[in-house]
């Protein structure tokens, strides 16, 4: 989990509009979502707890979690989901289930780059971040 800690600035996003569309996000929210480049901040809270915060001019969301334990999360598009985060072989796996669709996010750190691959059904998005702190 150590490799994921810090502040990450989004540099590139490919296919995010299709992910939002598949999740049923309305047109206006999709357009706003495509314009912003959020920072991702991952913090160790101690005692096996972590916080993941996504900050942008459009919206800020955060969740606190323990690896391997389910928790409730509100997504940036305001869906309430049951989430689970694990780390296996250097890959952070994040599952979000809103009871109609399941979103799978895999995050991998290579040097100062974090790559998040987002999948909903057969639709795939790749978001790339660079480490800033």
Swiss-Prot record:
GO molecular function, a single term: lipid binding
Residues recorded with modification N-acetylmethionine: 1
Entry annotated with the keyword Lipoprotein: no
Spans traversing the lipid bilayer: none
Keywords of this entry: Acetylation, Lipid-binding, Transport
Residues binding hexadecanoate, per UniProt: 107, 127-129
Disulfide bonds: none
Function field: Has been implicated in the acquisition, storage, and transport of lipids, and may be important to the organism since it is incapable of synthesizing most of its lipids de novo.
PANTHER family: FATTY ACID BINDING PROTEIN
Record note on domains: Forms a beta-barrel structure that accommodates hydrophobic ligands in its interior.
Entry's family note: Belongs to the calycin superfamily. Fatty-acid binding protein (FABP) family.
Protein name, entry field: Fatty acid-binding protein homolog 1
Species of provenance: Echinococcus granulosus
Gene name of the encoded protein: FABP1
């Amino acid at each position: 989990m150590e490799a994921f800690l810090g502040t990450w600035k989004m540099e590139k996003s490919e296919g995010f509009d299709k992910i939002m569309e598949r999740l049923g996000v309305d047109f206006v929210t999709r357009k706003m979502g495509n314009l912003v480049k959020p920072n991702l901040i991952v913090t160790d809270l101690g005692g096996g707890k972590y916080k993941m915060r996504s900050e942008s001019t459009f919206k800020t969301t955060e969740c606190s979690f323990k690896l391997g334990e389910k928790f409730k999360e509100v997504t940036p598009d305001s869906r309430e989901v049951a989430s689970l985060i694990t780390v296996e072989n250097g890959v952070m796996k994040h599952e979000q289930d809103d009871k109609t669709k399941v979103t799978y996010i895999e995050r991998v750190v290579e040097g100062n780059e974090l790559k998040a691959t987002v999948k909903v059904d057969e639709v795939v998005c790749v978001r790339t971040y660079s480490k800033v702190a």
